[in-house]
């Protein structure tokens, strides 16, 4: 979740989402991407549909991005993502596993909710 290099912009320069999503698609991942601002720019790099060995689709709803997901990567610290309750993540995801590259959630709250949570760089 989160495609821009920082919140408040649609700028993708140096965005960690680009390399990471590219690698996931090359390895056959099916991705549902969410970003409140940068999705149109991201679609220019990764058009919706089959890409490499995987697929990518886009949604304007965080809940839809999480629904039945096996893993969630957080690349941008959007306030919309920060508002998601750990319990909702647990309920929506098939496998509640989150890699948070922006440290937006409290690890103890995620653990208490039953979410396997990895906060990168903390």
Regions found by a protein language model. Give the residues of each.
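Structural/interface elements that position substrates and couple domains in central-metabolism enzymes
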Residues: 1-122
């Amino acid at each position: 979740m989160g495609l821009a290099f920082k919140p408040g912009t649609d700028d993708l320069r140096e965005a960690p989402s680009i390399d990471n999503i590219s690698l996931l698609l090359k390895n056959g991942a099916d991705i549902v991407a969410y970003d409140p601002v940068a999705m149109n720019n991201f679609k220019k790099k990764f058009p919706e549909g089959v890409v490499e060995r995987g697929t990518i689709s886009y949604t304007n709803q965080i809940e839809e991005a999480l629904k039945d997901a096996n893993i969630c990567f957080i690349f941008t610290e959007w306030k919309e993502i920060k508002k998601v309750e750990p319990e909702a993540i647990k309920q929506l995801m098939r496998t509640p596993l989150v890699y948070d590259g922006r440290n937006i959630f409290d690890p103890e709250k995620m653990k208490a909710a039953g979410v396997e949570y990895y906060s990168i760089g903390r």
